[in-house]
């Protein structure tokens, strides 16, 4: 059977990234409390395409993804990237996974449990020299009270919900929970999925006792 893809290309154009994008696939990720957690990720997988190739082997992306699906972890990302380069005859490889991650949180006073979902991402790349770059990212909902409005007002201050995106470049494993807690501890108050009246009182008083402007910088200072 004639294989057009494997025939040489004479246009002499190298393409930085070819592959698949936004493929939804079930994965298993590490969970600090329970050991592991099942979720569904939106996945991007790319490799470079040499100037003399017409195209890459698209089916191999999904084949490799299916093999790694039972245990996707930060520790394995480097091996996955090198495996992509090997099986697709590429010099560089890129892998991105974005998924909802669930953590059970208890309300601060009533201790009523509920699940919070956080958007998490893991991104990795391997260049032609074999240098690995790994980034873990979390998006954390928070509550903030404005210290400026509190200063100029006789009563109260304006408050708002927001999202803090924290990205960490790493070489050793890091828990998603640690990154999330780092952000929540830097906010005026963190967010809960379940609140009773006693909890509403608690989070309101805590937020207004802890007005914050620059939550992102506060998170960085706490990490350092």
Write out the residue ranges for each language-model feature.
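N-terminal intrinsically disordered, cationic/polar leader segments
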Residues: 1-223
């Amino acid at each position: 059977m004639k294989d057009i893809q494997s025939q040489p290309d004479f246009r002499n154009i190298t393409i930085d990234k070819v592959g698949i994008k936004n493929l939804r696939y079930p994965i298993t990720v590490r969970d600090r409390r329970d050991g592991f957690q099942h979720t569904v990720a939106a996945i991007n997988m790319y490799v470079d395409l040499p100037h003399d190739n017409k195209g890459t082997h698209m089916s191999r992306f999904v084949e490799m993804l299916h093999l790694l699906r039972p245990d996707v972890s930060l520790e394995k990302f480097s091996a996955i990237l090198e495996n992509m380069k090997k099986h697709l005859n590429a010099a560089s490889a890129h892998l991105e996974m974005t998924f909802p991650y669930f953590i059970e949180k208890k309300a601060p006073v009533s201790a009523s449990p509920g699940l919070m979902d956080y958007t998490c991402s893991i991104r990795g790349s391997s260049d032609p020299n074999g240098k690995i770059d790994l980034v873990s990212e979390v998006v954390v909902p928070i509550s903030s009270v404005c210290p400026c409005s509190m200063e100029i007002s006789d009563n109260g201050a304006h408050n708002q919900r927001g999202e803090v995106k924290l990205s960490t470049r790493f070489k050793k494993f890091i828990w998603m929970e640690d990154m999330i807690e780092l952000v929540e501890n830097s906010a005026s108050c963190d967010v809960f999925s379940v609140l009773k009246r006693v909890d509403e009182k608690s989070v309101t008083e805590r937020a207004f006792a802890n007005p914050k402007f620059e939550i992102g910088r506060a998170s960085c200072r706490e990490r350092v």
